[in-house]
Amino acid sequence: NEGKAKCGNTAGSKLTFKSADECTKTGQK
């Protein structure tokens, strides 16, 4: 899963697997 990154909301209660680019843009603040 090199192309996937684990992203969570600010509470960390939910994790979703998105593309690394999506993770960078929407998964992290």
Curated annotation (Swiss-Prot):
GO-annotated biological processes: killing of cells of another organism
Keywords of the record: Cytolysis, Membrane, Nematocyst, Secreted, Target cell membrane, Target membrane
UniProt subcellular location: Secreted; Nematocyst; Target cell membrane
GO CC terms in record: extracellular region; membrane; nematocyst; other organism cell membrane
Free-text comment about domains: Circular dichroism reveals that this peptide has random coils and small alpha-helix conformation as main secondary structure.
Biological role stated in the UniProt entry: Cytolysin that shows moderate hemolysis and moderate myonecrosis.
Name used for this protein in its record: Cytolysin Oshem 1
Species this protein is from: Olindias sambaquiensis
